[in-house]
C-alpha cells in the first residue's frame, strides 16, 4: 500500500502539494513513484518561471518511462529541490520529504483531494 499523509492535498495526476504562507510545495505521491519505478532524471523548470494550474510543470524520467508532472496551482516557481538534480532516486526513497518545486501562489484557485479521498481514488 502507498503512503498517503493526511496533511497534504492530492491531484488525480498523482501530485501532492502543501500550502504554507502563500507558497505551494509540490511533489509526486508514493503511488506515482511506485508506478514509475527507478527514477533516473528530473527535467526541472527555471526559477522565476510562471506556471498555470494544470500546465506541465516538469518531466520525471525513470527506467520505465518519462512522465509529465502537472502544476496543481498557478504561480511563480521560487525554489527547485537541487538535491534531486544529482540524486533523483531520492524521490523513490521518500517522495514526501523529497519535494520537487516551491511555487508562490498568484491566486487562491487550487483544489485537491484529501488523503482519504486520494486513497479511495487509487483504490487503497
UniProtKB/Swiss-Prot annotation:
Cofactor(s) required, per the database record: (R)-lipoate
Assigned GO CC terms: cytosol; glycine cleavage complex
Domain Lipoyl-binding: 23-104
Cofactor note: Binds 1 lipoyl cofactor covalently.
Cross-referenced InterPro entries: Biotin_lipoyl, GCV_H, GCV_H/Fam206, GCV_H_sub, Single_hybrid_motif
UniProt keyword Oxidoreductase, yes or no: no
GO biological process: glycine decarboxylation via glycine cleavage system
Oligomer status and interactors: The glycine cleavage system is composed of four proteins: P, T, L and H.
UniProt function note: The glycine cleavage system catalyzes the degradation of glycine. The H protein shuttles the methylamine group of glycine from the P protein to the T protein.
Protein name: Probable glycine cleavage system H protein
Natural source organism: Picrophilus torridus (strain ATCC 700027 / DSM 9790 / JCM 10055 / NBRC 100828 / KAW 2/3)
Gene it is expressed from: gcvH
Amino acid at each position: 500500500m502507498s503512503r498517503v499523509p493526511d496533511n497534504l492535498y492530492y491531484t488525480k495526476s498523482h501530485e501532492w502539494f502543501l500550502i504554507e504562507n502563500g507558497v505551494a510545495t509540490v511533489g509526486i505521491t508514493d503511488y506515482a513513484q511506485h508506478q514509475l519505478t527507478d527514477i533516473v532524471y528530473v527535467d526541472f523548470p527555471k526559477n522565476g518561471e510562471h506556471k498555470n494550474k494544470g500546465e506541465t510543470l516538469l518531466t520525471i524520467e525513470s527506467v520505465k518511462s518519462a512522465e509529465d508532472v502537472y502544476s496543481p496551482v498557478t504561480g511563480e516557481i521560487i525554489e527547485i529541490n537541487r538535491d534531486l538534480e544529482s540524486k533523483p532516486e531520492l524521490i523513490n526513497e521518500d517522495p514526501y520529504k523529497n519535494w520537487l518545486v516551491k511555487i508562490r501562489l498568484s491566486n487562491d484557485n487550487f483544489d485537491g483531494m484529501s488523503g482519504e479521498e486520494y486513497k479511495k481514488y487509487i483504490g487503497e
